[in-house]
Amino acid sequence: MSIRLPSLTPLLGALALAGTFLSAPALAADEVSLYTTREPKLIQPMLDAFTKESGIKVNTVFVKDGLLERVKAEGAQSPADVLMTVDIGNLIDLVDGGITQAIQSDTLNSVIPANLRGADGKWYTLSLRDRVLYVANDVELDSFHYEDLADSKWKDKVCIRSGQHPYNTGLVAAMIAHDGAEATEQWLRGVKGNLARKAAGGDRDVARDILGGICDIGIANAYYVGHMKNAEPGTDARKWGDAIKVVRPTFKNGGDGTHVNISGAAVAAHAPNKDNAIKLLEFLVSEPAQALYARANYEYPIRSGVELDPVVASFGELKVDSLPVAEIAKHRKQASELVDKVGFDN
């Protein structure tokens, strides 16, 4: 699939201005080691800019799977300074596994809302992934509650990926936090009854099947729409993206915020370069770094006021569910059990 990204040149130039928030330039020999489950190419421009402005070399180690196990096995001799991953569940697992440490940063605390960081400074959100409603262009719908997915009016009209995928167990966990386990079980049964096809595939497949007339609506992540609508004209991805619009749902019992998952990072428990690790995290939430990351990946920046990709901007302002994501994550196990109990993927 061919993706057309906006020009990053202006943003790379803007990153040169970000050095003003860094403390005195570090020695050229300074370094920081980043262990990340994210593809390095997605974050390399910011890391290069950080090195240019600070003199701190970033040693990037891509760990596709088993980040927790690797760092635990390395023990006190681990060279890891910063641990970066996606999904709040994965991040909390690193904390619970004892491989992160508490830090204090006024910069991070001022940029990142309290419900999107660890109260003890053991983890921080870097970007947001809102779980939204994909809607066929010919369906009139401007607002939606997640609970409405179980309404019989949508029978045979809903598409979604596996209920056991972390994107969906996260949403189910949020439903438990808002509405309770009993109501969430009934909701899951209602959603299953409204499915137009088996819960399977990926988020892009929701858009594909809306274009194909299989379903009218579906739950998926917003950033995929940025990728699809910015794909080359004539490609399948572009056709899928052009077939849908985005509505940000809210919870009936919980204000007017949308459920989000996150990408985030933490300082490793035995970080040999703790000060440099904190500097890197602070850089990653700076305005130009956030803008570059948001425009390259179409995720919503954690820092307010950052320029968005035009497609993402067209969705309107994101108001995040006020429940702390760490509180929602506590219900992940029960969410998975409920998905199995109702046979959601069968």
Question: What spans do the regions from the language model cover?
Answer:
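An extracytoplasmic/periplasmic, membrane-proximal ligand-sensing/linker region
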Residues: 299-346
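A bilobed periplasmic-binding-protein/Venus flytrap-type ligand-binding module shared by bacterial periplasmic
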Residues: 132-139, 260-273, 292-295
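Short beta-strand->loop
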Residues: 35-38, 119-120, 135-137, 155-179, ...
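Periplasmic-binding protein-like
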Residues: 157-164, 283-304
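Sec/Tat signal peptide C-region and signal peptidase I cleavage site
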Residues: 22-28
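Ligand-binding pocket segment of bilobal, Venus flytrap-like solute-binding proteins
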Residues: 174, 178-249
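A structural signal for short loop-to-beta-strand junctions that line the ligand-binding cleft
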Residues: 78-83, 101-132, 147, 159-160
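Early extracytoplasmic/lumenal segment of secretory-pathway proteins
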Residues: 29-93
